[in-house]
Amino acid sequence: LMINSIDGHIVSSTIEHDAVLKALGDNVTLVAPSKKGNIAPRDIQAAIRPDTQLVTIAIANHELGTIQPLRDIAEVVRTERRRRFEAGELTPIYLHTDASQGAGQIDINVARLGVDALTLNAGKIYGPKQVGLLWCNRMIRLQPLVRGGGQERGLRSGTENVAGTIGFAVALELVQQHRNSENKRLRQLRDQLQNQLTEAFPWAIVSGDQKRRLASHLHISFPGIDAERLVFMLERKGVLVATGSACAANSGTRSHVLEAIGLAPEAADGSLRLTLGRLSDSETCMAAAREIIAAINTEKARLA
């Protein structure tokens, strides 16, 4: 909806989810991240042109878990908006964030974030599948996605999914209510899992910003080990891991996120994305660590 409602330049990053990247079109500037997956506000500022109408940056990266400085990016956009107003320039500029990955772990209050538009995915917070949300500042003139009966403010006509909407609202209320305690719990489990793996394999590489990342995410690489083989070996043991985003698990290509942060091909090909959730506990994390260590040792022996 946002992209189809503007006709100007877009600024985004090279590590956005494919759902965003593949919809951006050609009139776009993609900002490169740091090696930790951070998007610098100064780079966003440098990428903005007189015809830029939209900046879209995910609140947190879906693979690395790195949390972006969205409030600082929002200040960059507000400063540009003020400059245009004072100069008599009429081109609007808006900030959108895909907060799907961060809901339940990050404060997504739109006023505090300073965004003009925000999207969420119910499935990411244990809500109904295939239900999404777009919050949008009223000053943005959106073009309809589906025309017809005028439901959902005329933007997406058709009979509303009432049950899905209610389920989404309840799920969002629950995850926000337990956000702080769940973050603390997941962070302890994640760190426990990370410590077990890095103690067993000191040469392993943990990617992402260690100080600013989602409590649920651990991205770790084992250079020289075929991660695809690990995935299949671990699945047989009941341990579900991924080599990249779940949506791209069967693409057979190297992660564009890992390429963007400059991770060496050998390390990228040995990367696992481990995510924790409501059902994770200390016992299951310890068991998962044991199985991962055993699988890597099996692969090392095979390659010796």
Range-by-range predicted roles:
Residues L1-A304:
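Pyridoxal 5′-phosphate
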